[in-house]
From Swiss-Prot:
Catalytic activity: Endonucleolytic cleavage to 5'-phosphomonoester
Keywords: Cytoplasm, Endonuclease, Hydrolase, Manganese, Metal-binding, Nuclease
Compartment(s) where it occurs, according to its Swiss-Prot or TrEMBL record: Cytoplasm
Full protein name: Ribonuclease HII
GO cellular component assignments: cytoplasm; ribonuclease H2 complex
Domain RNase H type-2: 26-214
Cross-referenced HAMAP family: RNase_HII_B
Family annotation (NCBIfam families): PRK00015.1-3 (NF000595), PRK00015.1-4 (NF000596)
UniProt family annotation: Belongs to the RNase HII family.
Protein function: Endonuclease that specifically degrades the RNA of RNA-DNA hybrids.
Binding site residues for a divalent metal cation: 32-33, 124
UniProt key word Magnesium: no
């Protein structure tokens, strides 16, 4: 499990009251994940508490942004957010727990790793991890809620960088191009070379590739 946290900062009551103008009594964090569908690599989650005193223009669902735009927003989010944490669940945890439960685990780690305790976690999707704070699921939240958009960007950029690192170790699969998703070239490499330690053996295409080399 990896976790990246913002430096701990003391929050005044005035600042806390402004985290979400529609919820003046709440400290709200947005939560999202990246990497549920790929055949390789960890699943990554992020939790973000935005600072309304330092607004960030251009936040959106990470999937609709270019890589260049995501990278630029990543730098702004880690600099201007009141608190953030990025966490992950490993390939072994995915294979042991299944991808859904591993995703919930990564989200839980991200929320619990925040340097400021939120009173509400808004989760992208239709279900929430078990948390020590109140949580609500918001379908398409990454396109609707700025803090969830910010979390989606941190999770996506972090995971893409992890897969570039994996490419350095296992160059035959092209992780730097497809980030572990089941593209035609990735599937062809799986059939030719078999899976590596970064592949999720609980996923059917990886199991099929294993069967070919047995």
């Amino acid at each position: 499990m990896t976790a990246i946290r913002a430096p701990r900062r003391r929050a005044s009551s005035d600042v806390q009251g402004g985290f979400d103008f529609s919820r003046p009594d709440e400290i709200v964090c947005g939560v999202d994940e990246a990497g549920r569908g790929p055949l390789a690599g960890p699943v990554v989650a992020a939790a973000v508490i935005l600072d309304p005193a330092q607004p960030i223009d251009g936040l959106d669902d990470s999937k609709v942004l270019s890589a260049k735009k995501r990278d630029a927003l990543y730098d702004l989010i880690v600099t201007r957010s009141h608190a953030y944490c990025v966490a992950s669940a490993s390939v072994d945890e995915i294979d042991t727990l299944n991808i859904l439960h591993a995703t919930m685990l990564a989200m839980k780690r991200a929320v619990e790793g925040l340097s400021v305790l939120p009173t509400l976690a808004q989760i992208d999707g239709n279900r929430c991890p078990t948390l020590s704070v109140r949580a609500e699921a918001i379908v398409s939240g990454d396109a609707l809620v700025p803090s969830i958009s910010a979390a989606s960007i941190l999770a996506k950029v972090t995971r893409d960088r992890m897969l570039v690192d994996l490419h350095e170790r296992f160059p035959v699969y092209g992780f730097n191009v497809h980030a572990g998703y089941g593209t035609a070239k990735h599937l062809a490499a799986l059939r030719e070379h078999g899976p590596c330690e970064a592949h999720r053996r609980s996923f059917a295409p990886v199991r099929a590739a294993l069967d070919l080399i047995r």
